[in-house]
């Protein structure tokens, strides 16, 4: 890859216009063939490949020629045939060609991304999952509307080719890409008119398609969002910084008070903030309801005009932050804004100000959690614990471990929220449901189960000390964490109720638009 990058730096116009010769570089397919042998691009067992097999570059050239002839399609997106000894070598060549095609297409994309990020240092720092939590803490208090937008992941192959055409001017290099995309669309795994861009299969080709598609979506949208903000110099802080204070004071209105002090309210122009995790994104907006409707309309119109793609209206949902349950990336919680009063002194008490802003205060949504537990058959609609009948065929240890895992995940999930006392009601429901499940399995009562297994068995699984077993904190830090918020970056992977809750919300929104 370094050689290809040097090739692009020597002559940028040549790199953009003549990518097709890179398809015939032997080193390129040697690298891709090594990736395939390492098992990074195929799930087939490697014992069927003999170490004495020679990799023929002439065969690769023939396959490249077959790609351009759509009547002679090669197998790129299906596994080996029932006879792996006869067809696995053919699959290795197909995987190598697909890997080589991806390596070539990554050259202009990586160079363009590098130059774009170098020119936007502030954008580079917000490309990590760890930026989600500062976004919640810093941007939500200054917003009153939240838009939950889902990136369209089903797109026609020709639209993808046209987006590549804006970056790659070499038309011959786009012919193999077009053929590969159409072949994937017509494969038995994807019998539909459009293709799924979301990388459900962890291959280099699908990851590249998804990254490029998201990059194109956000590169234009991000510039539009920046243009919509007229006060970019004013940072969202509890009080304005002293640096360039003469510029920031233009956005502040001073009210007189009886005690001759001055109270400052941070009054800003409409502000739009954007964050994305996976295929879902959140747009936090400070403005009126009309501004939110316009932002939603422009977002749908942008996708329709730029990508020639009709996006369903329910894929961009807006609601008021203080009245609804917010579905942040990986989190769903209720938010309460508490007024925060801060008094500052500047320049030897020549400027005394009282700053009033909002403090982000997430609340544990007990009622939605109870609804999810009822949906998963841990309790009824009134919150009364019931036995989990589908788990009665498991062993006692498996049942205890599953209930214990759900409780610990829920507790860690909402460790960044205040008002966690309601979580112990959830703990009571889960522990009693666990006892009823064991009693149903052994065809006895809860009292008999506790007597036979011992009360310490439930205390071990649902003990309060285990709430912090996954955190590398001391006892003092564990006690302090009861008063402080702790955000976990691996929450989207460990909470089993996020996807279920999100599906319920999506169905409700779709039903509203269908009416």
UniProtKB/Swiss-Prot annotation:
It comes from Pinus koraiensis (Korean pine). GO terms for cellular component: chloroplast. The keyword Lyase does not apply. The keyword tRNA processing applies. Pfam families: Intron_maturas2, MatK_N. GO terms for molecular function: RNA binding. PANTHER family: MATURASE K. Keywords: Chloroplast, mRNA processing, Plastid, RNA-binding, tRNA processing. The lineage of its organism: Eukaryota, Viridiplantae, Streptophyta, Embryophyta, Tracheophyta. Usually encoded in the trnK tRNA gene intron. Probably assists in splicing its own and other chloroplast group II introns. It comes from the Eukaryota. This is Maturase K. It is found in: Plastid, Chloroplast. One of its GO terms (biological process) is tRNA processing.
């Amino acid at each position: 890859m370094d050689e290809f990058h040097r090739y692009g730096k020597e002559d940028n116009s040549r790199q953009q216009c003549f990518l097709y010769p890179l398809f015939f570089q032997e080193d390129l397919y040697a690298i891709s063939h090594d990736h395939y042998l390492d098992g990074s691009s195929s799930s087939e067992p490697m014992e069927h490949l003999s170490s004495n097999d020679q990799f023929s570059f002439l065969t690769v050239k023939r396959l490249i020629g077959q790609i351009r002839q759509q009547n002679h399609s090669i197998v790129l997106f299906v596994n080996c045939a029932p006879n792996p000894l006869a067809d696995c070598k053919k699959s290795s060549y197909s995987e190598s060609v697909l890997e080589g095609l991806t390596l070539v297409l990554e050259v202009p994309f990586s160079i363009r991304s590098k130059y774009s990020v170098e020119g936007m240092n502030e954008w580079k720092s917000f490309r990590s999952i760890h930026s989600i939590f500062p976004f919640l803490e810093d941007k939500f208090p200054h917003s009153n509307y939240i838009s939950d937008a889902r990136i369209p992941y089903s797109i026609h192959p020709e639209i993808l080719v046209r987006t590549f055409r804006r970056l790659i001017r070499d038309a011959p290099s786009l012919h193999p890409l077009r053929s590969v995309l159409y072949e994937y669309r017509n494969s038995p795994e994807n019998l539909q008119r459009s293709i799924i861009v979301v990388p459900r299969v962890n291959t280099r080709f699908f990851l590249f398609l998804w990254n490029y598609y998201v990059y194109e979506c956000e590169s234009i949208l991000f510039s539009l969002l920046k243009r919509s903000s007229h006060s970019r110099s004013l940072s969202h802080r509890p009080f304005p910084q002293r640096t360039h204070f003469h510029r920031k004071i233009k956005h502040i209105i001073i009210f007189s008070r009886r005690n001759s002090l001055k109270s400052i309210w941070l009054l800003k122009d409409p502000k739009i903030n954007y964050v994305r995790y996976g295929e879902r994104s959140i747009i936090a907006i400070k403005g009126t309801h009309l501004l939110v409707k316009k932002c939603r309309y422009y977002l749908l119109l942008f996708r329709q005009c730029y990508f020639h793609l009709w996006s369903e209206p329910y894929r961009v949902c807006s609601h008021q932050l203080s009245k609804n349950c917010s579905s942040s990336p990986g989190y769903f919680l209720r938010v309460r804004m508490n007024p925060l009063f801060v008094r500052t002194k500047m320049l030897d008490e020549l400027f005394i100000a009282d700053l009033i802003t909002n403090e982000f205060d997430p609340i544990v949504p007990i009622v939605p959690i109870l609804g999810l537990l009822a949906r998963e058959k841990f309790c009824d609609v009134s919150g009364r614990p019931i036995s989990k009948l589908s788990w009665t065929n498991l062993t006692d240890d498996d049942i205890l471990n599953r209930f214990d895992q759900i409780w610990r995940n829920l507790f860690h999930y909402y460790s960044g929220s205040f008002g966690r006392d309601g979580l112990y009601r959830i703990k009571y429901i889960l522990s009693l449901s666990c006892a009823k499940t064991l009693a149903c399995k052994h065809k006895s009562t809860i009292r008999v189960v506790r007597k036979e297994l011992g009360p310490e068995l439930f205390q071990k699984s649902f003990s309060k000390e285990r709430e912090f077993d996954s955190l590398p904190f001391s006892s003092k830090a564990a006690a302090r964490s009861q008063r402080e918020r702790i955000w976990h970056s691996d929450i989207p992977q460990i909470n089993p109720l996020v996807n279920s809750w999100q599906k319920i919300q999506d169905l409700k929104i779709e039903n509203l638009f269908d009416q």
